[in-house]
Design a protein with these regions (language model features):
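Short, small-residue-biased leader/transition segments that mark boundaries at the very start
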Residues: 1-6
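Conserved GNAT-fold acetyl-CoA-binding loop/helix
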Residues: 23-44
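A short helix-loop-beta-strand connector motif used in the catalytic cores of GNAT acetyltransferases and
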Residues: 43-56, 73-75
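Conserved acetyl-CoA-binding loop-helix of GNAT-fold acetyltransferases
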Residues: 99-116, 133-138
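Conserved active-site alpha-helix within GNAT-family acetyltransferase domains
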Residues: 108, 128-145, 153
Length: 162
């Protein structure tokens, strides 16, 4: 049984360890550039905590995953190339989804939680992040096109309407 809870400042060390594990996994599976240059760092996590947007996924009392979920407009989603969003209504955005690698089902647990909060969700991922693309598509997200994050890096954009 998974449960999702807002994470607190005292969880930062564990979350940073999960991000390190996720980066190592991505690098070992052909995605060496998605989370480079120290991203995501503690400052981003603290900002997410202060805004009430960061969550941990807990299994048997252990933090096994993390994600950020924000309802409202995502600045990098204002321009989409090679396609379009399914709808233009209010949506939630999932960012920084990562797993400790200890248990399976972290992405699904995140998606199921988020879709209960709002019926329209958007997410993006790196073209080399095949594991995340698979999880996103397996859940039923629709590939919409390409967006560009801060710094100009391209991401594949998806949305889901329940």
């Amino acid at each position: 049984e998974f449960r999702r809870v807002l994470f607190r400042s005292e969880d930062i060390e564990q979350i940073m360890a999960i991000f390190t594990t996720a980066k190592e996994y991505m690098a070992a599976h052909g995605n060496k550039t998605q989370w480079g240059d120290g991203y995501p760092g503690e400052e981003i996590l603290k900002t997410d905590i202060d805004a009430g947007n960061s969550y941990v996924i807990v299994n048997n009392g252990m933090i096994v995953g993390t994600f950020s979920f924000i309802i409202g407009k995502e600045p990098t989603y204002q321009v989409i190339k090679n396609g379009k969003w399914t709808d233009d209504r209010l949506y939630g955005t999932i960012h920084r989804l990562a797993s400790s690698g200890i248990v399976k089902g972290i992405a699904r647990a995140c998606f199921e939680y988020c879709i209960k909060q709002i019926d329209y969700i958007r997410i993006d991922t790196h073209k080399d992040n095949i594991s995340m693309q698979t999880a996103i598509e397996r859940f039923g997200f629709h590939k919409c096109g390409n967006i560009y994050v801060k710094g100009g890096a391209e991401r594949i954009a998806y949305d889901y309407i329940s």
